[in-house]
């Protein structure tokens, strides 16, 4: 008798995706982040659902409803901090997942990669709107500053901003719609994740060598299920340490003050995971130019398949491009640091140099190094 998991219409989809899926035998721990992101998404949806049961999306009561969750709801403080720090965990895994894709040339799976870029934008939008909901000082001013960037769009900018605000400033209407979008987007993300996996399973996974692994596949279960469980345990341990010992480490103290439109905080800055993009935005003196650079800093990922010049897929055997890659990583850390600093000397010039090098490495230096490496190998294939 054939096993039910191979015949049942629903179970066989799960079987082909997580049990009998042929996977390359040599994928390293860098391939764990997909499953970790799935766990992060589930944690965020569940904690978010319980928070939404007690939260009110009204300017008069939003801040106090979050206080009520932390003080009066059973384990409300735990749910709230799991949700807030879960977002940070989500972005840590996201950046590592994207970094893995860049290093090993996974972007050559065009459909999977492009859905991934859309997912990144969707997660960033969700996180931004979620940061507005507690209605603290940084929530209000962050929302004001970031939505105001749209006014840089010629002709329709001002109208567009007022349409998004639902008035002439960030107010009750803005908070209500941000809550609605923040609630619905994770489910759209979950649907996109399924499409992401669908396209991935059409081609099969990449592997560290970047070579074809058709000749040597192993079943996903038990080999990679047990490996994923180890990754999940490590991530959850890290998350719980963060939540139980340092819950406010990654937050902004200003957000413990209720939103006040009459009092601007000394340094308006987003959450840590947006600081690199914020630094790029601020490094350009022109408003429209800054907005374009901000969007391009993420959208540039969609160009990677077209910027790949090497005959090798992975960076595993390409020392010059490897060096450039790690310089890029260091550069992103510098941008993240600059994004959290005030706009004054020497931070302005450091931010501008880091922004120029960010785009230069991806658009110019990496494609050139790919050609040089091929020439050095005398590959005339």
Curated annotation (Swiss-Prot):
Q: What is its main location?
A: mitochondrion
Q: Name one GO cellular component term.
A: respiratory chain complex III
Annotated localization: Mitochondrion inner membrane
Q: How is the cofactor bound?
A: Binds 2 heme b groups non-covalently.
Which positions are annotated as binding a ubiquinone?
A: 201
Q: Which UniProt keywords apply?
A: Electron transport, Heme, Iron, Membrane, Metal-binding, Mitochondrion, Mitochondrion inner membrane, Respiratory chain, Transmembrane, Transmembrane helix, Transport, Ubiquinone
One GO process term, biological-process aspect? mitochondrial electron transport, ubiquinol to cytochrome c
Please name the Pfam families in this protein's record. Cytochrom_B_C, Cytochrome_B
Query: Could you say which residues bind heme b b562 here?
Result: 83, 182
Annotated heme b b566 binding lies at 97, 196
Mark the transmembrane ranges: 33-53, 77-98, 113-133, 178-198, 226-246, 288-308, 320-340, 347-367
Query: Entry's CDD domains?
Result: cytochrome_b_C (cd00290), Cytochrome_b_N (cd00284)
Q: According to Swiss-Prot or TrEMBL, what is its membrane topology?
A: Multi-pass membrane protein
> What protein family is recorded?
Belongs to the cytochrome b family.
Q: What does this protein do?
A: Component of the ubiquinol-cytochrome c reductase complex (complex III or cytochrome b-c1 complex) that is part of the mitochondrial respiratory chain. The b-c1 complex mediates electron transfer from ubiquinol to cytochrome c. Contributes to the generation of a proton gradient across the mitochondrial membrane that is then used for ATP synthesis.
The entry's protein name is Cytochrome b
Species, as recorded: Apodemus flavicollis (Yellow-necked field mouse)
